[in-house]
Amino acid sequence: MARIAGVNIPDNKHAVISLTYIFGVGRHTAKSILAAVGIGPTTKIRELDDAQLDAIRAEVAKVPTEGDLRREISMNIKRLMDLGCYRGLRHRRSLPVRGQRTKTNARTRKGPRKPIKK
């Protein structure tokens, strides 16, 4: 198994699919990374030599991935909460942020039902 950006990449899969195991790299980004390096998308990771893997590592390093991306996302949410805007309030109350209905549904975001005490 090759190790790219701190993630073990499966050897037996195509390069495009293998790169999507990295948080922050989807299929489109994986295709653009491979195009920049000059590797075909159907090439398997085990067929690549060390120089090609190093080139892929260098390209992946240019994209925010893994811990940096998770930190950036959490800081964006924290910024919204500190501003006190509507989206920040919805995050703070653990309710849906993007305008979904909450009278029914939204159980995943709200958590299990709380019984009414009499």
Swiss-Prot record:
Disulfide bond sites: none
GO cellular component: cytosol; small ribosomal subunit
Alphabetical UniProt keywords: Ribonucleoprotein, Ribosomal protein, RNA-binding, rRNA-binding, tRNA-binding
UniProt xrefs under InterPro entries: Rbsml_uS13_C, Ribosomal_uS13, Ribosomal_uS13-like_H2TH, Ribosomal_uS13_bac-type, Ribosomal_uS13_CS
SUPFAM superfamilies: S13-like H2TH domain (SSF46946)
Region (Disordered) residue spans: 92-118
Record flagged with keyword Ribonucleoprotein: yes
Recorded superkingdom: Bacteria
Keyword rRNA-binding: yes
GO biological process: one example: translation
GO molecular function, a single term: tRNA binding
Regions crossing the membrane: none
Record PANTHER family: 30S RIBOSOMAL PROTEIN S13/40S RIBOSOMAL PROTEIN S18 (PTHR10871), SMALL RIBOSOMAL SUBUNIT PROTEIN US13M (PTHR10871:SF1)
Family: Belongs to the universal ribosomal protein uS13 family.
SUBUNIT field: Part of the 30S ribosomal subunit. Forms a loose heterodimer with protein S19. Forms two bridges to the 50S subunit in the 70S ribosome.
Entries under HAMAP family matching the protein: Ribosomal_uS13
General function of this protein: Located at the top of the head of the 30S subunit, it contacts several helices of the 16S rRNA. In the 70S ribosome it contacts the 23S rRNA (bridge B1a) and protein L5 of the 50S subunit (bridge B1b), connecting the 2 subunits; these bridges are implicated in subunit movement. Contacts the tRNAs in the A and P-sites.
Protein name: Small ribosomal subunit protein uS13
Gene: rpsM
